[in-house]
Amino acid sequence: MHGTSAPALNVEQGVNLRTLNAFGLPAAAATLVRIDSEATLRRVIDHPELGRAPKFVLGGGSNIVFTRDPQAVVLKVEVMGRRLVQERPDAWIVEAGGGENWHDTVAWTLAQGWPGLENLALIPGSVGAAPVQNIGAY
C-alpha cells in the first residue's frame, strides 16, 4: 500500500530557553515542539504522550519571566506568513501567522501602503500574543 504520511514531529529535548525570552533568563524545556502550522498543533494534541502532557505556549518571549523550568511540554509558536485577505475602500483585512514579529508586521503593512497600525509600532511581541499581551493594552 502506498500513501503519504506526515513527517515525524520534531520533538526537541533539553532545550535552553535563554534565547527564547526577552530577559535572557535561564530556563530549560525538557520537551519543546516548534509549532509551524495548525496541522503540527493538531498532531501534538493527538500524540499519545504529548497530547496528555501539560502544555506551555511560548510566543516571542517578551512577557515571560522564568523563575524555574517549565513543568510542561513547551509549544513554541512559529506559524509564519502574512497576506491581504480583503481590501475595502476604508480598510484592509490582513492575516498573519502567530509567530510573526508584531513590529515587523506593522512595518510590512505600512510598506504595502495600508495605514492604521503605525501607532502600534515598536511594541515587543508576536502577532499571536497581540490580543492578550503588550499590544492588547492599546
Summary of predicted features, one role per range:
Residues 2-138:
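Anion-binding (especially nucleotide phosphate/pyrophosphate-binding) glycine-rich loop
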